[in-house]
Curated annotation (Swiss-Prot):
InterPro entries: Stress/Tellurium_Resist, TerD. This is Uncharacterized protein YceE. Belongs to the CAPAB/TerDEXZ family. It holds the Pfam family TerD. It comes from the Bacteria. It comes from Bacillus subtilis (strain 168).
Length: 192
């Protein structure tokens, strides 16, 4: 039975799940019926950051144009441009054993592609969630439903995976940003 988290809750991933080395971070969402006549393309990304909350270089940013971190520790399984259907819309696979030692945190985010041009925002998104699945057993370990707390935001930091005392933990963030992917990149120390 998966643990249901609320915004701000933290939970130990690797300590409470001995043997967990690879996790599937599944992200899903629905878009409301009215979307202004444009396709709604949401994109999941991962920012691998150091102790200063910054990506060391552009390769620490895993997204639809850079599907795999050089370490092999974070892999994006590909862009879903419609969000149609049930279950995960996009997935990011994290192999904790391959994450470089200088990486302290992995920020998992979702943005709306071309949000400003299409007049779209997270106020038009519902049923957004993130879940963590043990890749080996396929057991869902935890789930965080984001709720309907957004309006004008075009980017969301959904959660963070972070190191603590040799273990990996999960932090349910659910924090919205205006300014889309560019704002998130700046937040994590990347030049855009």
């Amino acid at each position: 039975m998966a643990i249901q988290l609320s915004k701000g809750q933290r939970i130990d991933l690797t300590k409470t799940n001995p043997g967990l080395t690879k996790a599937v971070i599944g992200l899903g969402w629905d878009t409301n019926k009215y979307s202004g006549g444009h396709d709604f393309d949401l994109d999941a990304s991962a920012f691998l950051v150091d102790a200063h909350d910054n990506c060391v270089n552009d390769l620490d940013f895993v997204f639809y144009n850079n599907l795999e971190h050089p370490s092999g520790g974070v892999i994006h399984t590909g862009d879903n441009r419609t969000g149609e259907g049930d279950g995960d819309d996009e997935q990011i696979i994290v192999d904790f054993s391959k994450i470089p030692a200088h990486i302290e945190k992995i920020g998992i985010t979702v943005t709306i592609h071309d949000a400003e041009a299409r007049s779209q925002n997270f106020g038009q998104v519902s049923n957004a969630f993130v879940r963590v699945v043990d890749e080996e057993t396929q057991n869902e370990l935890l789930r965080f439903d984001l709720g309907e707390d957004f309006s004008i935001e075009t980017a969301v930091v959904v959660c963070e995976l972070y190191r603590h005392g040799g273990e990996w933990k999960f932090n349910a963030i659910g924090s919205g940003f205006s300014g889309g992917l560019a704002a998130l990149c700046r937040n994590y120390g990347l030049q855009v």
